[in-house]
Every structure is written in C-alpha cells, then in structure tokens.
From Swiss-Prot:
The gene is arl8a. It comes from Xenopus tropicalis. May play a role in lysosomes motility. Alternatively, may play a role in chromosome segregation. It is found in: Late endosome membrane; Lysosome membrane. Pfam families: Arf (PF00025). This is ADP-ribosylation factor-like protein 8A. The keyword rRNA processing does not apply.
C-alpha cells in the first residue's frame, strides 16, 4: 500500500515539479562521449560520429528531469577545459573506452588529475566503461581496478560497463543520473 502511495506521490510531483540537472561528460578522444549523448537523447546509435571539437551542449528531457549535458572534446588540447565545465555540476560522467587497453593508463591519469582540482571536490562521478560489446573489453571489476577508482575517497563514485552500440546498461546509467538530480536538490 505504501509503495502505491509513493508511486502516486511521484506521479503527482512530476506534474508540478520539474527537476533540472547539469552534467559534464569528459574522457579521452574516441571513448564514445558524443555517441552516448545521442543514444540517451534519441535512442539511436550512429556509427559515423565526428570527434567533438571544443564542446557541445545539449538539453535532454527524461520524464520530469531536464539534463543539461556538456560534452567536452577529449583530445589533449581540450583537456585543460575539463575543469572549467565540471565546476558546479550535479555530476561528472567520465567515459572510458573499455576495449582500448593501451589508453587505460592515460585515461586513469586524466581522471585522477581532474578530480584533484579543489573546485571539483565532492562532485559525484559516474565512470562509464563503453564498448563492452567488443571482445576483450574490460568489465566493471577490471575497470575499477585499472582506473584505481577505490583510491577516490572524497566523493561518491560509481562505475558501469556499457555499450552505446547495443544500448547495454543505458537504462541503469540514466537511473543513476536522474537519482543524482534529486539528491543534489535536497
């Protein structure tokens, strides 16, 4: 009975209260950041993506939550911009190409360098290991170990293994993001 009441209350709140959140999506080039944005916005996977030059901003509405998503280029010349776009956001989404093991060390270093910035302290981080559909891609446990995520103690950190191409775990990723739009307001 209580569950039914809570669902009814959530439905009622959704009619009158809209939630907004701001996210920044960063990670090395070719990890699938822009593809991820397109998949959550339209449900469509496009094989022919052009690397982001600088940044893109997109607003996506899911239920009563509007997500303002900053997609920042991952090439070395754009990485100095990451901190600026991560300040004050609801969460940082860090994309990793889980199938490109040669870049895992560089990806780990960039993530830890970013999170060492004082102005980003306490902002939750969602690490997404993309391209799990490719044989040999790291799973969540391997990503946590290779990215040294257990060393990050000053904030909430979560890691999912996803495939934008197959839309694997996109639903739980969205649930995590929406949950964090609610937790930032309270």
């Amino acid at each position: 009975m209580l569950a039914l009441f809570n669902k009814l209350l959530d439905w009622f709140k959704a009619l009158f209260w809209k939630e907004e959140m701001e996210l920044t999506l960063v990670g090395l080039q070719y990890s699938g950041k822009t593809t991820f944005v397109n998949v959550i916005a339209s449900g469509q996977f496009n094989e022919d993506m052009i690397p982001t030059v600088g940044f893109n901003m997109r607003k996506i509405t899911k239920g009563n939550v509007t997500i303002k998503l900053w997609d920042i280029g991952g090439q070395p010349r754009f990485r100095s911009m990451w901190e600026r776009y991560c300040r004050g956001v609801s969460a940082i989404v860090y994309m990793v190409d889980a199938a490109d093991q040669d870049k895992i060390e560089a990806s780990k270093n960039e993530l830890h360098n970013l999170l060492d910035k004082a102005q980003l302290q306490g902002i939750p981080v969602l690490v997404l290991g993309n391209k799990r559909d490719i044989p040999g891609a790291l799973d969540e446990k391997e990503l946590i170990e290779r990215m040294n995520l257990s060393a990050i103690q000053d904030r909430e950190i979560c890691c999912y293994s996803i495939s934008c191409k197959e839309k694997d775990n996109i639903d739980i990723t969205l649930q995590w993001l929406i949950q964090h739009s609610k937790s930032r307001r309270s």
